[in-house]
């Protein structure tokens, strides 16, 4: 006869890596999500401090400057090769490109920086009815034009800054709809792989036609 099957322990033991936790044990585990694709609040603060120290930005305006920079990246693509035009709205003698250069000094990429502000940028565009500049060229339709920026995937990430108020429909529902129909052309975002039409167990076209994307992707 073989060895008898051991009886599971009545209580979870953290000292035993094979001990089976109960739901109450899992609830007691404190976990903070960390992703390398989104800048951390500490990294964002380090970048804005560089703006103050190296470019002379007033310390009480760095938040506005950061949101403006992320919004500008939404128009041109959040990459090292992006050409940023215009000036910082809180210090008109400083170019946006100069602000962007300090991002690299902090060892952060433009995509990571922008991803932190994805929810803010998205709601800003909805509130002002001002989608990314090249949405049509990027292959988006009018109903999904507000999703036409290359850090949109961070809109429903817990690592992105959450606006105090949202001008859009609930993020999770709207993001599910927007991501479902995103079909940017390969030349617009070459790093993206083909997106299969499925979302939360629902299949593509037949499910999508039952929803009003216009109401989900435009401001109230």
UniProtKB/Swiss-Prot annotation:
Broad class of the protein's primary localization: virion
Keyword list, A-Z: Capsid protein, Helical capsid protein, Ribonucleoprotein, Virion
Cysteine pairings via disulfide bonds: none
Domain of life: Viruses
Residues in the signal sequence: none
This protein's record includes keyword Transferase: no
GO CC annotation, single: helical viral capsid
One Pfam assignment: Flexi_CP
InterPro entries assigned to the protein according to its UniProt record, in alphabetical order: Pltvir_coat
An example molecular function term from Gene Ontology annotations: structural molecule activity
Location(s), subcellular: Virion
Family: Belongs to the potexvirus capsid protein family.
Function: Required for genome encapsidation. Forms ribonucleoprotein complexes along with TGB1 helicase and viral RNA.
Name this polypeptide is given: Coat protein
Organism of this sequence: Cymbidium mosaic virus (strain Singapore)
């Amino acid at each position: 006869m073989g060895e008898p099957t051991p009886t599971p322990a009545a209580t979870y033991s953290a000292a035993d890596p094979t001990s089976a936790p109960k739901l109450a044990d899992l609830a007691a585990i404190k976990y903070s999500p960390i992703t390398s694709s989104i800048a951390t609040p500490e990294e964002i603060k380090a970048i804005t401090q560089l703006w103050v120290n190296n470019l002379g930005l007033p310390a009480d305006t760095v938040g506005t400057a950061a949101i403006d920079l992320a919004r500008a990246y939404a128009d041109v693509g959040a990459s090292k090769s992006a050409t940023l035009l215009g000036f910082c709205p809180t210090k008109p003698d400083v170019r946006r490109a100069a602000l962007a250069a300090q991002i690299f000094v902090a060892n952060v990429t433009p995509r990571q920086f922008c991803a932190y502000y994805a929810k803010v940028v998205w709601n800003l565009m909805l509130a002002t009815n001002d989608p990314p500049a090249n949405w049509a060229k990027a292959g988006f339709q009018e109903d999904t034009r507000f999703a036409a920026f290359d850090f949109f995937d961070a809109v429903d990430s817990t690592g992105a800054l959450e606006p105090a108020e949202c001008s859009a429909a609930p993020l999770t529902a709207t993001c599910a709809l927007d991501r479902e129909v995103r079909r940017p052309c390969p030349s617009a975002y070459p790093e993206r792989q083909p997106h299969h039409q499925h979302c939360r167990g629902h299949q593509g076209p037949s499910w999508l036609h039952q929803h009003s994307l216009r109401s989900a992707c435009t401001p109230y």
